[in-house]
Curated annotation (Swiss-Prot):
One of its GO terms (biological process) is viral budding from plasma membrane. This is Matrix protein 1. The keyword RNA-binding applies. It comes from Influenza A virus (strain A/Chile/1/1983 H1N1). A motif (Nuclear localization signal) lies at residues 101-105. InterPro entries: Flu_matrix_M1, Flu_matrix_M1_C, Flu_matrix_M1_N, Flu_matrix_M1_N_sub1, Flu_matrix_M1_N_sub2, INFV_M1. Pfam families: Flu_M1, Flu_M1_C. SMART domains: Flu_M1_C. Homodimer and homomultimer. Interacts with NEP. Binds ribonucleocapsid by both interacting with genomic RNA and NP protein. May interact with HA and NA. Cannot bind NP without genomic RNA. The gene is M. It is found in: Virion membrane; Host nucleus.
Length: 252
């Protein structure tokens, strides 16, 4: 796996699933391929994205700044600086300075990542802030190692939270989660179907599924009524793809 592929993987792991994630993935691909060279426009686009947490925006802003060539005098962005200040905790800043000194001596991506993984997410964010604000300089490989270590810590905590929801025994939470997943799957089907004539059937299935979820929420239904709803939709989507000549593994 190449360095930039690894960075893209880690960064996308902390972005919530949805149309915005696909947009961000495309922006990262363009940046890493050298196709997007307007850092100012890129940062303005990032600043106005909804849903993303300030820290996620800060990390993405840091990645873009490291990767896109820019004029030396280009202004640093406040939304990135605020996100990478370690919540203003002086302890985070102290640890960040210690980490920075270690990273300065490290020139490899994996070496920097290993060192950074022993620090808290707050200290890691503060260290990124030091580098972003030009208070310190490390190799690009070391900076990417720092970014990936931060993303790994964030993704770990998100995974624990996600697992707690998946294994919850509360039937109401499970019911709502199944309906949310079915609704987002239907939306994705509508987007993938496009405007071809063959797409009408897939669009109809997706539309009916969304109407069903709305009705279930409106009238209140038994928690078991949503079982298998998302899987039924995915089977329909796969059947549609087969007819269109697209062979894909099932993504349950």
């Amino acid at each position: 796996m190449s360095l930039l592929t690894e960075v893209e993987t880690y960064v996308l792991s902390i972005v919530p699933s949805g149309p915005l994630k696909a947009e961000i993935a495309q922006r990262l691909e363009d940046v890493f391929a050298g196709k997007n060279t307007d850092l100012e426009a890129l940062m303005e686009w990032l600043k106005t994205r909804p849903i993303l947490s300030p820290l996620t925006k800060g990390i993405l802003g840091f990645v873009f700044t490291l990767t896109v060539p820019s004029e030396r005098g280009l202004q640093r962005r406040r939304f990135v600086q605020n996100a990478l200040n370690g919540n203003g905790d002086p302890n985070n800043m102290d640890r960040a300075v210690k980490l920075y000194r270690k990273l300065k001596r490290e020139i490899t991506f994996h070496g920097a990542k290993e060192i950074a993984l022993s620090y808290s997410a707050g200290a890691l964010a503060s260290c990124m802030g030091l580098i972003y604000n030009r208070m310190g300089a490390v190799t690009t490989e070391s900076a990417f190692g720092l970014i990936c270590a931060t993303c790994e810590q964030i993704a770990d905590s998100q995974h624990k939270s996600h697992r707690q929801m998946v294994i919850t025994t509360n039937p109401l939470i499970r019911h709502e989660n199944r309906m949310v997943l079915a609704s987002t799957t239907a939306k994705a089907m509508e987007q993938m179907a496009g405007s071809s004539e063959q797409a009408a059937e897939a669009m109809e299935v997706a539309s009916q599924a969304r109407q069903m979820v709305q009705a279930m929420r409106a009238i209140g239904t038994h928690p078991s009524s949503s079982t298998g709803l998302k899987n039924d939709l995915l089977e329909n989507l796969q059947a549609y793809q087969k007819r269109m000549g697209v062979q894909m593994q099932r993504f349950k």
